């Protein structure tokens, strides 16, 4: 009821998109370092204490001076009795106004630890995103991007930050993987269109290398996805973004997810009969960059009853964390990891925790047939 206090069940926990992804990846067996910033306030000190007591190390966390006006980022979600989100409030100013020397700390971390992947979420400002991604590119570390929200998803499409540019097409792409939902994908597509990214000569050269035929293309897309998604333009928009982000996992809510990615020349999927239904195009030229285009719709791992749903807040983060744990392994293939990642999401959906501890049970299901 508005304009008055209401009875509620209130719980507190360490969280945030980056924390959840890191914890899920850790549960799934990956070696993970969470890197973020907190203030020297009650929330920041509490978070560092919880990290020290958890499976995640606090060594990647930088604590800023609360006297300088910094506040540890906090997020408050209000859910209804069905556990669906009604309203949320976020204080993320610290992720926008960090001191300029923070990039030196990140550079040192990446140089010393030499990770295979850096996962970055769009809670950071466009300026800081640019710094993080530049460090990853310099160190030849692959970047996975989690858009977080419709509003924040466009932060990689800012002309003044040079993150995604007309020139940053495969193989010069700056982001290797992104995991938007359908609303974020549509917004990212429109932002790229506004930047004229689909008009550059580099984009056209890359798109033409896919050698996609317009004849029967709608029927093929419908056979892989469904008419509703095609009419909405979801697979088409994903394809047009591929030159800039060559691996997309589009979250479709209760419809599962859509995987769209570029195959390199000679990829086993191009000659595997079992993969034929998912090969949207094959390059017949002598391109050393693109061998074909793979698109596959993954239905939900499980239909979860309403009375089994505990929280919807961390399911996407859990899915990405499990996916990254697999991709960090030598030999892992993204299409084989997605069903496992979906199982992780289901376990979190049934848990009161932002990331279900039962994700640990998925360690043995992560395969070793690498593509990314």
Language-model regions: role of each:
Residues 1-35, 39-53, 75, 87, ...:
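Glycine-rich phosphate/adenosyl-contacting loop at the front of the ribokinase-like
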Residues 26, 137, 328:
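Gly/Ala-rich phosphate-binding loop of Rossmann-like dinucleotide-binding domains
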Residues 37, 66-70, 75-122:
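Conserved phosphate-binding/catalytic loop of the ribokinase/pfkB sugar-kinase fold
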Residues 50-69:
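A glycine-rich helix N-cap at a beta->alpha junction
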Residues 54-58, 156-190, 279, 283-294:
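Structural recognition of alpha->loop->beta junctions
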Residues 136-147:
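Short beta-strand/loop segments at the ligand-binding rim of alpha/beta enzyme cores
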Residues 152, 190-372:
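Conserved phosphate-binding/catalytic region of the ribokinase-like
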């Amino acid at each position: 009821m508005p304009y008055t206090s209401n009875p509620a069940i209130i719980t507190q926990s360490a969280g945030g998109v980056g924390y959840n992804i890191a914890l899920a990846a850790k549960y799934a067996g990956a070696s993970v370092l969470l890197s973020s910033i907190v203030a020297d306030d009650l929330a920041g000190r509490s978070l560092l204490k919880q990290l020290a007591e958890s499976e995640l190390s606090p060594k990647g966390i930088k604590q800023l001076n609360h006297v300088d006006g910094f506040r540890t980022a906090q997020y408050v979600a209000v859910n209804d009795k069905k556990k669906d989100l009604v309203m949320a409030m976020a204080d993320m100013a610290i992720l926008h106004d960090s001191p300029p020397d923070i990039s030196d700390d990140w550079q040192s971390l990446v140089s010393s630890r030499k990770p295979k992947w850096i996962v970055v979420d769009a809670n950071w400002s466009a300026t800081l995103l640019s710094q993080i991604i530049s460090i990853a590119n310099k160190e030849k570390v692959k970047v996975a991007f989690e858009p977080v929200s419709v509003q924040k998803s466009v932060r990689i499409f800012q002309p003044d930050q040079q993150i995604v540019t007309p020139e940053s097409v495969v193989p010069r792409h700056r982001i290797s993987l992104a995991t938007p939902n359908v609303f974020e994908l549509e917004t990212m597509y429109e932002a790229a269109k506004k930047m004229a990214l689909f008009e550059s000569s580099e984009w056209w050269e890359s798109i033409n290398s896919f050698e996609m035929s317009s004849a029967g293309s709608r029927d093929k897309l419908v056979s892989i996805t469904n008419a509703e998604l095609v009419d909405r333009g979801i697979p088409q928009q994903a394809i047009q973004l591929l030159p800039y982000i060559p691996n997309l996992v589009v979250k479709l809510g209760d419809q599962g997810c859509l995987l769209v990615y570029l195959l390199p020349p000679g990829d086993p999927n191009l000659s595997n009969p079992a993969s034929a239904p998912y090969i949207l195009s094959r390059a017949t030229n002598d391109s050393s960059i693109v061998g074909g285009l793979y698109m596959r719709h993954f239905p939900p791992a499980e239909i979860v009853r309403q009375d089994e749903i505990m929280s919807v807040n961390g399911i996407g983060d859990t899915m990405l964390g499990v996916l990254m744990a697999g991709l960090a392994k030598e030999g892992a293939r993204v299409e084989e990891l997605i069903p496992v990642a979906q199982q992780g999401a289901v376990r979190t959906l049934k848990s009161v925790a932002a990331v279900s501890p039962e994700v640990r049970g998925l360690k043995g299901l992560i395969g070793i047939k690498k593509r990314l």
